[in-house]
A protein has these predicted regions:
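Conserved functional hotspots at enzyme active or ligand-binding sites that engage polyanionic ligands
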Residues: 1-107
Length: 107
């Protein structure tokens, strides 16, 4: 299955420990396509259907998925955890994700 940056995919996140987001849920692929093309792992941000107004949570309104991308719970997963691809988010959402990623990890 070809998987690209900023696509929403269904991922089995179990097993987890403590406060990590768990269960099978939609996630946003964060890793760049250069990595996605060659590696068996992907960097993802889980998507939750309910969220408080945290600066690291970005609202996503995909075709089949609505919720908040949880940037503070980014993790790396094996491709075998992915069961479905829901498609890419909007350009406006991509810009917001990039802004929050930069603020979180660069600035």
């Amino acid at each position: 299955m070809e998987l690209n940056q900023y696509e929403i995919v269904l991922v089995n996140l179990d097993p987890t420990i403590g406060s990590e987001i768990k269960k099978t849920r939609p996630c946003l692929i964060i890793s760049p396509n250069e990595m996605n093309k060659f590696l068996q792992t992907l960097i993802i941000a889980p998507i939750t259907s309910t969220s408080k107004a945290y600066p690291t949570r970005i609202e996503i309104k995909g075709k089949e998925t609505k919720g908040w991308a949880v940037i503070d719970q980014i993790r790396t997963v094996d491709r075998r955890r992915i069961t479905k691809n829901f498609g890419k988010i909007s350009e406006k959402e991509i810009l917001k994700i990039k802004e929050v990623l930069k603020e979180t990890f660069v600035d």
